[in-house]
Swiss-Prot record:
InterPro entries: DNA_mismatch_repair_MutS (IPR005748), DNA_mismatch_repair_MutS-lik_N (IPR007695), DNA_mismatch_repair_MutS/MSH (IPR017261), DNA_mismatch_repair_MutS_C (IPR000432), DNA_mismatch_repair_MutS_clamp (IPR007861), DNA_mismatch_repair_MutS_core (IPR007696), DNA_mismatch_repair_MutS_N (IPR016151), DNA_mismatch_repair_MutS_sf (IPR036187). The lineage of its organism: Bacteria, Pseudomonadati, Chlamydiota, Chlamydiia, Chlamydiales. ATP binds at residues 622-629. It comes from the Bacteria. Belongs to the DNA mismatch repair MutS family. PROSITE patterns: DNA_MISMATCH_REPAIR_2 (PS00486). This is DNA mismatch repair protein MutS.
Amino acid sequence: MTSKKTTPMMKQWHQCKEKAGESLLLFRMGDFYEAFYDDAIVLSQNLDITLTQRQGIPMSGIPVSTINGYIDRLVSKGFKVAVAEQLDEAQDNKGKSEPLSRELQRFITPGTLLSSSLLPEKANNYIVSINRVGALFGLACLDFSTGSFLLQEYDNMKDLVDEICRLAPTEILSCDKFYKKHADIIEQIQQHLKLTLSTYADWAFEHQFATQKLSLHFHVSSLDGFGLKGLVPAINSAGALLSYLQDKLLLPVEHISIPKTQGNQKHLLIDTASQVNLELLTPIHDPQGKSSLLHVMERTSTPMGGRLLRNTLVNPFYDQKEILLRQDAVEFLLDRSELRKNLKSLLSQVRDLERLTTKITTSLAGPKDIGMLRDSLNASIRVCEVLSPLPLPKFFQGRFTLPIGLTSLSELLSRALLGELPLRISEGNIFCDNHHPDLQRLRYTKEHSKEWLWQYQETIRQQTGVKKLKVCYSQALGYYIEVSSDFAPLLPKEFIRRQSRLHAERFTTEKLQEFQDDMLNISDKLQTLETQLFKDLCAQILQQREEILSLSQVIADIDYILSLSDLAAEYNYCRPIVDTSDSLSISGGIHPVAQTLLDKGTFIPNDIKMHSTRTRMILITGPNMAGKSTYIRQIALLVIMAQMGSFIPAKSAHIGMIDKIFTRIGAGDNLSKGMSTFMVEMAETANILHNATDRSLVILDEVGRGTSTYDGLAIAQSVVEYLLFTEGKKAKTLFATHYKELTDLENHCPHVENFHASVKENGGQPVFLYEILKGHSQKSFGIHVAKLAGFPLCVISRAQQILRQLEGPEATSKQPQEKELQLTLF
């Protein structure tokens, strides 16, 4: 609240704070950005900055020179930051009673980073906007750092949540009405992601406003030409997001691309639970570790290629044509090791073309950024020149003919810019001397002023014949030419008299005045000239913006294929047959992550052979630690790799495309929703039963173990039967279980086959062979595993005694009655 005693400067602060709202306001005051009141306390607590007071008002400050690092720290903690800039310089305001002009100029939020150490180089940084119209959810997804804009719609909450979790945004935008009505959606998302929730006005999500906002931005009268016809919820989300960025956060939006929809593209769907369970992006128990599939496959050299690999890993293809195109391209490079080496070297010189273009579009680029663009364009063009003469596979054909404007731009940047460039324009030394005649003259004048004066003095001595003529300098006159009074009449008419002395006359010339002007203002002139030249160069770059972004996509695709071919070459992967058949046959398959973590040749390969008309359900029994879980995960990972267009670690493989992968592996309590481990297990299994199809792959590990023996067995068998006999749900299923009773199903159903994780006994001790063989397991060796885990020997001994009782002659059934089991414990 302002008061009568509030200073004019603090009135400015209150006006800015009102606009900043919930954001933490950094208010420029000379060489510091200051925070006041509660903002000052928050700043002090989170950045370890001294908290002081001015007239009883809490305040803390950050030096202007270090502002970006502090903003990054605040944003990483989930804060939104508003920055009020000083519009006048202090010297310009000297003698005036009113304060310097200040206004709120920008906001920084987790989802709107443009230039920050927080931006992950090889991952997108998304902000998403969601709303609902009728039964449909609309999702708009924007990577503000690249301008990539995606729209999608969903008819159920689960698919929406899965997609948001796949995208892993850092910020979500919606209106109060949506948040209140769909708190469950936000809760589900927050279980998997750390993100910031942002709220915007309800009216911004109205269709008329959203349509108008998008149409104005993209300069069209209709959005139908973008393939958005009928996508009302998605358009509403997109229009609100654009307005939020431009109108509320005051951010530049010129770089935001025309929104794309998934359209007819088909992808293998991997739900959130499966992404986590299969450790596609992040290891479950070691988030910084090396046991994710992404870590194994990551061989890319460019940020764009890295982002493409990451996105494709969680969104593989369900389109044979797209898969085969990439397989052919991988094979093409796989057979050419020298070409791969050459391309790798060139790609390592390519920086982030997408984000560099965004920085230029939004006027945030500095000279070093333009230098990186120059080097990246040169290397990218060289990549195209290397590949274009070759007999290319279809995936690459027609993609390396570069527009004349792009090659001309590359040549211009190489001619215009110096080799080493500064971070800021104000540091100067950006352009080559010959880029502009005034630049060369000013620099030469500055660097050779004494030499120039001496040469000029000698020149006019020779021209006039006055050998004692001198070029001098004084504070009052500046530079002047002095001759004795006797020789003054000999000087040409263009010499301009400045001063008469007792025995001497002082003159100047236009050339000397020009030199003086240059010397007096040379630094300012140089900075002004280079600033203007820099702006002109950025404008020329932006004329080729779309061509640069197209080249960026080409480089990303090459980098992606090269990464897959390097991986295949390093581990001797095979090319799988991927088609529309119902086959899932892999010979000598190896877990791609385990292969890299273990010594070479120590991982035991295993096979699988499934078909919808023959075996489509495999029951796997065997002791813990024998490799059951590794095996079933392995099959899912190999399918994912194959449908990315990658080769896979196996001797051979024939994979009929899978439309969805579901996993029910492990569990933990979900305390935030009051769900026990067993409830989480049942919820995930229910999702599988509702959403699996005949072309899905289902991975089940120990379903039913979280309850009583009979309950668990009943649930497990019912799930198996449902997936075996329900039309439209006959998915290929790998079921690891300790329920030996389930293995009897093989005798009654031709589509079920038993396998087991093999174990050899040596002196009464099990030796795990890690082979998956036909037939069911005879023993579980659970007590041995307990012993390895460090159980007290007395507990192990008692367990062995109880086991002998249960397995003795008095046990007349395969499964003991629960009452009998209880009696043996006392």
